[in-house]
């Protein structure tokens, strides 16, 4: 079998293009989800990490029945430390975070535009997933 420089170049370019296309397809399927928690020395941060691990299923991970991730296909969730409830609500409302832990009073104040959120537009799109 004889190889030419042009043939090797063409094969190399084809391999790079194929790899690039495959990587682009995987990258397009990825979804990221952030969970605002609390300080790293407190309870909410590790709880957020457990939730993030439970809902994540990165591409290439083992199947659920083989001991791998059982979460949402293509999702990479991460717990992010924060200064707490007010910080988490503000981060969600600004689009910086997808979700976050918040005390019920802070969530209520954000929803109604009262309390520590007095003077701000009521966050009528804010939703509760669970009470801690």
Each predicted region: which residue ranges?
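Sec/Tat signal peptide C-region and signal peptidase I cleavage site
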Residues: 21-27
């Amino acid at each position: 079998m004889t190889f030419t420089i042009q043939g090797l170049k063409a094969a190399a370019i084809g391999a790079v293009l194929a790899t690039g296309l495959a990587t682009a397809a995987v990258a397009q399927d990825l979804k990221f989800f952030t969970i605002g928690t609390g300080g790293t020395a407190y309870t909410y941060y590790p709880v957020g990490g457990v939730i993030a691990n439970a809902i994540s299923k990165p591409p290439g991970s083992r199947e659920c029945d083989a001991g791998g991730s059982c979460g949402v296909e293509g999702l990479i969730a991460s717990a992010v430390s924060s200064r707490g409830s007010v910080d988490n609500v503000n981060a969600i409302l600004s689009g910086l975070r997808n979700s976050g832990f918040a005390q019920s009073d802070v969530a209520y104040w954000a929803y109604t535009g009262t309390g520590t959120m007095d003077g701000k537009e009521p966050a009528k799109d804010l939703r509760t997933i669970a009470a801690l």
